[in-house]
Amino acid sequence: MKNIIFPKTLKKGDQIAIISPAGFVEEASLQSTINLIKSKGYQPILGKYTLGKFENGYNYSGTEKERIQDVNWAFNNPEISAIWASRGGYGCQHLLRHLKLSEFRENPKWYIGYSDNTVIQSY
């Protein structure tokens, strides 16, 4: 049986990446999340495509390539201590085959998300 490796406890000043691996999110809707993160003493860092929009029968936050770029950036950036998914929706399952987790497995971090994001959490 493998040992479970838990992420480090967050401390004030840590950076939390905010990404949108599924649905599109309005900037105004994200402001309360940004304010909460700041109020706890953390630094919110938005992914390049967090506020993007790509319509393809569903309002994604970006193309599959753009969304996976943000996810892999957040997972593998050593300066990021936690990842906050801006919303659920649809589309995370399409990203699984593109996840690059080698660095993440050596330095795990908290992944905060619900709905469609649980497929990434369980991967």
Predicted regions and their residues:
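ATP/NTP phosphate-donor binding region
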Residues: 1-79
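Active-site histidine-anchored catalytic micro-motif
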Residues: 59-123
